[in-house]
Amino acid sequence: MTSQSQGIQQLLQAEKRAKDKLDEAKKRKGKRLRQAKEEAVAETDQYRMQMEKDFRLKQAKIMGSQSHLSDEIEEQTLEKIKELNGSYNKCMESVIKQLLSMVCDMKPEVHVNYRATN
């Protein structure tokens, strides 16, 4: 009987050691998973920061060029307005004279398509 109880005790001890090893392996696995998760979060944060930095640089570059274009368009518009005002002042007198002569100097004529019926 003692040999049986010794065998049972050995089996129980072996089972306990196996359970302890499994528990230790589960703990190591959990620790590795937490560490991998932390590394992944750190890596994604670093990637996000780099992408945001690149985006801000590109945005600043584009906005700067748009500002330059808007200044250029404003300058061209002012030049065109000055040109049109100069043309207006130069031609205003002759256009008014021509318009008044067309309205005031009437020359009655018979239309070419008019047929006299007798």
Swiss-Prot record:
InterPro entries: V-ATPase_G (IPR005124). Kidney. Gene3D superfamilies: 1.20.5.2950. Residues 1-12 have a biased composition (Polar residues). Residues 14-26 have a biased composition (Basic and acidic residues). Keywords: Coiled coil, Hydrogen ion transport, Ion transport, Transport. One of its GO terms (biological process) is proton transmembrane transport. Residues 5-53 form a coiled coil. One of its GO terms (molecular function) is ATPase binding. Signal peptide: none annotated. GO terms for cellular component: cytosol; membrane; plasma membrane; vacuolar proton-transporting V-type ATPase complex. Pfam families: V-ATPase_G. Residues 1-44 are annotated as: Disordered. Subunit of the V1 complex of vacuolar(H+)-ATPase (V-ATPase), a multisubunit enzyme composed of a peripheral complex (V1) that hydrolyzes ATP and a membrane integral complex (V0) that translocates protons. V-ATPase is responsible for acidifying and maintaining the pH of intracellular compartments and in some cell types, is targeted to the plasma membrane, where it is responsible for acidifying the extracellular environment. V-ATPase is a heteromultimeric enzyme made up of two complexes: the ATP-hydrolytic V1 complex and the proton translocation V0 complex. The V1 complex consists of three catalytic AB heterodimers that form a heterohexamer, three peripheral stalks each consisting of EG heterodimers, one central rotor including subunits D and F, and the regulatory subunits C and H. The proton translocation complex V0 consists of the proton transport subunit a, a ring of proteolipid subunits c9c'', rotary subunit d, subunits e and f, and the accessory subunits ATP6AP1/Ac45 and ATP6AP2/PRR. Belongs to the V-ATPase G subunit family. This is V-type proton ATPase subunit G 3.
